[in-house]
């Protein structure tokens, strides 16, 4: 039995930046000021639980902050303008760990609105990133999740229309939705697939290749991770067996029955340690060898960190 690792996999630059910002803040202010994070810093159970053990308090609203002397960190997914304003009124120090690629979408949405465009957002309802984008503009945004949503759209002025997208969507699904939007509204403007995060695209392209050369694919990532779920969907769409797991403890050996080659990848919010533990578990229990997929590559993207 052989393990084949996808490349690239795991942490993207935006997730690494957010996790590092939280770790540095915690180290700088430990024993002095309480560190809060609005929602999960990234969608990964291992990361969140690790920070909880170090004293970080994760809150679901600004009202949950008990100590106004505390420090509040906005997660990688970004927040609405109203939440920013509420934090200012609360008087807490804010450190923004929003992924720069998400911030780019915020600016695009505002720019379209300022130019008088009616806006469509391609994204998943209730995802924190989507809530943040919607909350960056004053006028209502039409949310599109499926092709059927495109057909159901009620638009005031089809000739004055723009769209933006969530950064962690399926490239293939989004491409179809954009094509349908352009077919129905020929004058619509938008960024094509440029708003889909580079890491999301790279991991989806890699997992497609991985599915072709393996019998079963294991995706390391949390159930609430949008990009991890898209990797799962992609594998299943190819007809391959695929499973999304938080860590090696979630493994079921029956999943691997009849498999000679096991593909392993990880969502953009899953740390390397979880992949390493899974590989070690399989090496010990299944007598496997390990290789990296052909044509893989290492990402070299880095984002500037917030100054504080």
Swiss-Prot record:
Its EC number is 1.17.7.4. The active site is at residue 129. [4Fe-4S] cluster binds at residues 12, 99, 197. It catalyses: isopentenyl diphosphate + 2 oxidized [2Fe-2S]-[ferredoxin] + H2O = (2E)-4-hydroxy-3-methylbut-2-enyl diphosphate + 2 reduced [2Fe-2S]-[ferredoxin] + 2 H(+); dimethylallyl diphosphate + 2 oxidized [2Fe-2S]-[ferredoxin] + H2O = (2E)-4-hydroxy-3-methylbut-2-enyl diphosphate + 2 reduced [2Fe-2S]-[ferredoxin] + 2 H(+). Binds 1 [4Fe-4S] cluster per subunit. Dimethylallyl diphosphate binds at residues 43, 77, 127, 225-227, 269. Its cofactor is [4Fe-4S] cluster. One of its GO terms (biological process) is terpenoid biosynthetic process. Keywords: 4Fe-4S, Iron, Iron-sulfur, Isoprene biosynthesis, Metal-binding, Oxidoreductase. Belongs to the IspH family. This is 4-hydroxy-3-methylbut-2-enyl diphosphate reductase.
